[in-house]
Amino acid sequence: VMENNAVRGVVIESKAGRQAILAKVVVDASGDGDVFAAAGAEHEQRLHAVGLVHRLGDVDRADLAKLQAAGFQNLGGAEPLPSVHWVNLRGPSTDGLDIAELSRLEVEHRRSIWKRVEQLRTTAGGETLFLLQTAPQIGVRITRLLAGTRKMTEAEARSGNQYPDTIAIGGTYDGGRGKPGFAIPYGAMVPRKLDQLIAAGRCLDVDSPMVEDMRLIATCLLTGHAAGAAAALAVKDRCRPRDVDIPKLQALLRRQGAYLG
């Protein structure tokens, strides 16, 4: 729902039918930038590997060395119990906005997992293994990236750069092995031209090398916290999200337990 250049709400479909939900500030936490794209904000689209994760049970009774010798290299890792392994099977780079392709891959990946488990169970060392759980839906890693008022770059992130509008310190994709945490600027969450909308999650304005780090769940949570706080301040101070008082926002986040460096 638009009024001139400002987002005033969203239209949804539910069991109650079609409804409009209006707000003074809208936070797009869809992960795919669904709201800012529909509103006409500048953005780019990326392709990335999709996948379907699953868990294997009775792993502690299996002979993993025999299974790996037989060619099953990806047997996941123990999580949360020694008897349970979490396995991540990556698929091809895919348009995560193509619902027909996602539906096809959903079926393909589930069949592939069942087939793989059957093969494991008929291989020496894997007789006791069973499929404990599959993810509720196929995992999409990245789709749209917002064009914000500030772009995050890997060069800045790896240098330990602090932005004037830092709203969080994110973690790294490799678990910190050789890569430090990095500051996230508020400007990466705010559209260049669109008003009354803030983006949160993996769809912020970052360069290609930063995509893997920004899509981590913990980092997405941090940006969601900042987006909610900024939206509340914008409403309270009767200003546009791009005009939020940054020191006031940072002070609010710190009072709520956020670490900003």
Segments predicted by a language model, with ranges:
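Flavin (FAD/FMN)-binding glycine-rich loop and adjacent Rossmann-like elements that form
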Residues: 1-4, 9, 13-14, 18-25, ...
